[in-house]
Amino acid sequence: MKLARFSFEGKAEVYNGVIEGDFIHTYSGSPFEQIEILQEKYALHEVKLLSPIIPRHIIGIGKNFVAEGSIKPPMPELPIFFYKPLTTVIGPDDPILFPSNVTEAKFEAEVAIVIGKTAQAITPDEASNYILGSTIANDVGAFQFFHEEGHWTVGKAFDTFCPLGPYIDTEFDYNNARIIARLNGKELQNSTMEQIITPIHEMISYISGFMTLMPGDVILTGTPAGADFMRAGDTIECIVDGLGTLSNTVQQR
């Protein structure tokens, strides 16, 4: 099932929907409990897709991919995690806004995992039971604010620095998913989730050991080699086979 949030005809009202083919059907209820698909539907080309979720928390993992053909190192005892506030979240086609003190930032195409139910100190074997689904993320970072000893949050926390979308797929198999990123049409990232160092089930278990994960929380699972800098006027497309394309342009605020 492909879950989305959308608006229609420029109205402020936000609808929840299930995408089926070229249409999106509205639904009632909560994706974390039970939904009922309603008769009302819209053509996809008539609506504006929004971020498919407004998470309470966004947790990212850094340095979690190896280049294809490289020897994969063992999973680190202490993975690099960072935090993004919900004010970083935007949806498909929304602008990434650089504040006056940022002139360039890196894009990072990633698979994002959406948590489906409260998870506290769960085991890796239990992790799949706590996943609602997957979506695409662009984990934007202003590297000039990264601390040399690994403090990343400041550079990751600017408003609009976490595009998500276009939808959450509740049945997506992320294990071998291919991740691609194009900057102004030029392909700069192309790899698969097979190159991940800390597996997703281990990631979820580890995080749930030091903080309770809530329904709707988002985990950014890392990005392959090739991430590069983008500047005002650029367009970045993050593509995951089976999850669609997340496209955003960059503007100077």
Say what each PLM segment does:
Residues 84, 109-111, 115-117, 135-140, ...:
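Short, structured patches in soluble enzyme cores that scaffold and shape functional sites
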Residues 48, 52, 68, 74, ...:
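Catalytic-pocket segment enriched in acidic/His residues
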Residues 120-136:
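N-terminal accessory regions of nucleic-acid-interacting proteins
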Residues 54, 60, 91, 106-108, ...:
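Residue-level recognition of short, solvent-exposed, well-ordered loop/turn junctions
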Residues 92-112:
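A structural-propensity feature for long, helix-poor, extended segments
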Residues 75-92, 107, 237-241:
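Structural signature of FAD isoalloxazine-binding scaffolds in flavoprotein oxidoreductases
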Residues 1-79, 172, 182, 186-187, ...:
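N-terminal non-catalytic cap/leader segment that marks the start of a structured domain
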